[in-house]
Amino acid sequence: MDTTRYSKWGGSSEEVPGGPWGRWVHWSRRPLFLALAVLVTTVLWAVILSILLSKASTERAALLDGHDLLRTNASKQTAALGALKEEVGDCHSCCSGTQAQLQTTRAELGEAQAKLMEQESALRELRERVTQGLAEAGRGREDVRTELFRALEAVRLQNNSCEPCPTSWLSFEGSCYFFSVPKTTWAAAQDHCADASAHLVIVGGLDEQGFLTRNTRGRGYWLGLRAVRHLGKVQGYQWVDGVSLSFSHWNQGEPNDAWGRENCVMMLHTGLWNDAPCDSEKDGWICEKRHNC
């Protein structure tokens, strides 16, 4: 039987019957191979698409889960933010209340401080009045003693019970006076007088002032008088026994508190008074003490 050789796709050859029957057999196999190839390709594409769809579905599910998680977290964060806002509001209200209480407390404290200052001022004034009263009482006692000494002076020749003034001291109306030659500061002068059981001179009136003027011997002397200041300004003058100044014998234009530091008073050689710095060493001093009777 005649045969015809045909080549297959794979490179090998195949013998088929010759003639029309052989050619028919050969060409009838080709559509089968084509259909098989198309089927295989389709299956492959179906598998690939199935894999891609499965992967896309998985990723979509993951994205949806992530989106749900984000929404859940966002809801939680929103709730937490709302809670924080409420807490901030509560804190703001609390702070406002505390601030109001603080302002009220400050106002009450200010009122209490004002009342305390008023009470302290009243107490200070009362203390000053008591001190002034005691000093004036002491001065009154000394005045009575002076009058008594004057009465005793009238019978001095018949009664010599009072001790004489120390050597270099001058006597006048029941008191002894010492006029220094050296010069020093006001504080040192007061110390010198205290060492002699005396004090810087207190001028009680015109008679005593005349006695002092007559014995200046051309020198200046510290008196027992100092300025009283309040808030840096001179409010008055006070003797060393605590009594405020009543009698005065100021020089013209005095006291002037030059440079705001003239706190002590001295007597010029003319007998007139002048305010001066307490640390000045240009003047002597006059000590005074009562006779020892």
UniProtKB/Swiss-Prot annotation:
Pfam families noted in UniProt: Lectin_C (PF00059)
InterPro entries, per database record: C-type_lectin-like (IPR001304), C-type_lectin-like/link_sf (IPR016186), C-type_lectin/snaclec_domain (IPR050111), C-type_lectin_CS (IPR018378), CTDL_fold (IPR016187)
GO cellular component: external side of plasma membrane; plasma membrane
Superkingdom per UniProt: Eukaryota
Compartments where located: Cell membrane
Tissue expression as described in the entry: Expressed exclusively in fetal and adult liver and in lymph nodes. Specifically expressed by endothelial cells lining lymph node and liver sinuses (at protein level).
Coiled coil ranges: 96-136
Keyword Glycoprotein appears in the UniProt entry: yes
GO BP of this protein: alpha-beta T cell proliferation; immature T cell proliferation in thymus; immune response; negative regulation of alpha-beta T cell proliferation; negative regulation of immature T cell proliferation in thymus; negative regulation of T cell mediated immunity; positive regulation of viral life cycle; symbiont entry into host cell
Cytoplasmic domain ranges by topology: 1-31
Glycosites: N73, N159
SMART domains linked to this entry: CLECT
A GO MF label: virus coreceptor activity
Extracellular topology ranges: 53-293
Phosphoserine: residues carrying this PTM: S12
Domain C-type lectin: 172-287
Paired cysteines (S-S): C264-C278
SUPFAM superfamilies, sorted: C-type lectin-like
Transmembrane segments: 32-52
Alphabetized UniProt keyword annotations: Cell membrane, Coiled coil, Disulfide bond, Glycoprotein, Host cell receptor for virus entry, Host-virus interaction, Lectin, Membrane, Phosphoprotein, Receptor, Signal-anchor, Transmembrane, Transmembrane helix
Membrane topology annotation: Single-pass type II membrane protein
Subunit structure, interactors included: (Microbial infection) Interacts with Japanese encephalitis virus envelope protein E.
Function: Binds mannose, N-acetylglucosamine (GlcNAc) and fucose, but not galactose, in a Ca(2+)-dependent manner, in vitro. (Microbial infection) Acts as a receptor for Japanese encephalitis virus.
Protein known as: C-type lectin domain family 4 member G
Annotated organism of origin: Homo sapiens
